[in-house]
Amino acid sequence: EALGAKADQMIVATASYEVTDPTVDSQIVTLQASGADTFFNFATPKFAAQAIRKVYDIGWKPMQFVPFSASSVGAVLVPAGLEKSIGIITGGFVKDPADPRWKNDAAFQEWLAWMKKYYPEGDVTDQLNVWGYLTAQVMAHLLTQCRDDLTRENLMRQAANVKNLQFPLYLPGLKLNTSETDLRLIKQMQLMRF
């Protein structure tokens, strides 16, 4: 949709997989054979790691994009191989716990303390844990906005009326906004390259 009328000229191949497939190796080989120079690796974490590894192993060097859900250093890039993940691009919206620049950040330190207390077995390099924490903060905010009217209707009304909400574990400058016609909270991302 985003490519409009040029989509047929720009998309040279697509490949899908089933979650019951043992690997996505054959799909990657097929995509490489198409001559594609860009690879949108929109897979779940397990299969994204397999795809990253296979792309590297067969010597294919496309510009590679992965979705936020498959960009976790701990859950995807380490299993794929860090050296095999160099150059991967994603859209980010949370402070990545594997990024050393946030090591002394107050919000990051608060999250680490929370992880140690409530989820000590959790992977502190997995940004999906940060996302879960932030999702809980958003929910707490919405419930607070409901005050004493804790009905589904009021919760949905509050969810449709978020204006410039910020939490310190989102990337600086990211603001959450919703409306009655668009309940998606995340509308801003920053491109990041590993």
Where are these regions (language model features)?
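Stable alpha-helical elements in mature extracytoplasmic
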Residues: 1, 20, 24-27, 47-51, ...
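Active-site lining segments that contact anionic ligands and/or coordinate catalytic metals
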Residues: 37, 61, 85, 186-189
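Extracellular/periplasmic periplasmic-binding protein-like sensory domains
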Residues: 55-132
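Segments of small-molecule ligand-sensing domains
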Residues: 117, 122-130, 136, 140-194
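Sec-exported extracytoplasmic/periplasmic mature domains
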Residues: 4-5, 29-36, 53-61, 78, ...
